[in-house]
Amino acid sequence: VDVVGYQAEDANQVLAALEQKKLVVVLMWPGHFTASGHFIILRGLDEDGKVVVADPSSRERSEVSWDFHLIVDEAAKKAGANGPFWVIG
């Protein structure tokens, strides 16, 4: 499986990957998804262009579509392996 890391300034590459139906792992900082640090999966885009997530600690957050820019804003600013976004496939 190919995995490519992207930083927040490469958000357009991440959005393009979602448009290609690729999964994206994201390390989040405190905000809507976590109080400390937390991984979520971006599963794709809904019909309105919002992001559908898989949040292992919240079924409720997994059933809501999210604004892509909110996710980018709350993603970790410092992450190893070229993160905080990792595109799978």
Report each predicted region and the residues it spans.
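Active-site-adjacent substructure of cysteine-protease-like catalytic cores
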Residues: 2-58
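Noncatalytic regulatory segments and standalone regulatory/sensor domains
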Residues: 19, 23, 45-89
